[in-house]
Amino acid sequence: LDMEIPALSSFSSGVNLDTLPASEIETRLRDFFSGRIANPKPDELIQSVEQLEQQYGRYKEFQFAKAAALVQACDFAGARAILLDLVKQMPSDSRVLHRLAIADLNMGAAHEAQDVYLSALAAAPKSENLRREFAGLLRVMEAKKLYVGIDRKKHGLAAVCAIKNEGDDLLEWLHFHRLVGFDHFYLYDNGSTDNTRAVIESFPWPEMITYHFVEGEFGQMRAFSHAIDTYRNCAEWCAFIDADEYLFPTQAGNIKDVLAELGPAPAVAVHWLNFGSNGHEARPAGLCIESFTRRAPDDFPDHFIMKSIVRPDTIVSYLHPHQSLVLGCYVQEDGTPVFPIGGRCTAPKRSKLVINHFYTKSREQLLKKRERGRPLADGDPEKIRAMEFFTLRDRNDVEDATIQRFLPELKKLIQG
């Protein structure tokens, strides 16, 4: 994520910008800030745009780039001021209007965002993203009016998880997350053929599980979207996680104790730690959290990836398996505002909450995982990943037993 900003001289390459159309300037600006990482440091972007303005003049494209960087830096008021000025110059530019709506949403300004979405849709009536986000915002606003003063939430903290052939470790996963504070599990089974159903039925608290068996082209995105649409008013918080992810508090006894410190925040970014195989060829006899104790180093690229704990009644649109667009601003575990991009944050924090991502497990389990594919719809060309993707993540550099403070109680629960 420490992407270097190129030299300013590389931006214009000797061309007079006044002779270029706006689209070409925009392309050059995008190339100037290009990189494989989606979220370079926003303060560096802001500084570089200001330097470009000083050297080349006040182009609208520079202003838009600066507003985008201010959004990444969570200076939504600063971004909004620039975008409002751009709207005066380009009242029918749906790109500018959309960015303004995003700034308003992050400020919690629902009515302002509603008005901007209407203008954006007038400029781009066929945009599926705009239509979906506008409809989601209306649902959030209507629910807030409909249920004012009424608490219909049955659960404090629920997990939403898409599963397939996870019978080996699912019982441990359920017991573990109940132990750290989860009240309910919304499980979407995408056509399991192993003992997954029997494992779920063996869980001693069946009332804690809502189970959906779906087949074919259902996939994770549709599962999570269904959960949001169906259960958005049933839980105070929902964590959207996978069956190989163990979310827990590093110090507190209960995740809800950490969430209580965050006040009315609508969404929390919780970061991965990626664990390797510990050299196991076959599935070990012990529990997952006691068998896989070695992980990648802190600066491993996947450790910038986050998952979300969200107040589901604030979700405007489900953007990505790792994040949602919400009414309000994401925060880190300590309440620091953050604007994730593509499920990543530049400065991950893990002193209070963390996700141990047991991605590879043993080689035997890794091969099974690759065979069943990603939680995507059948026929998706991205469903089966190359073997190299897995082997690159089998990192065992650091011994980390933080999660094992829950091990004695977890064993008691599993053993009955």
Language-model segments: residues:
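Register position in tetratricopeptide repeats
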Residues: 38, 72, 106-107, 136, ...
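Catalytic-site signature of metal-activated, phosphate-bearing donor transferases
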Residues: 222-225, 249-416
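Residue-level recognition of tetratricopeptide repeat
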Residues: 34, 68, 102-105, 136
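A conserved acidic beta->alpha catalytic loop
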Residues: 189-199, 205, 216
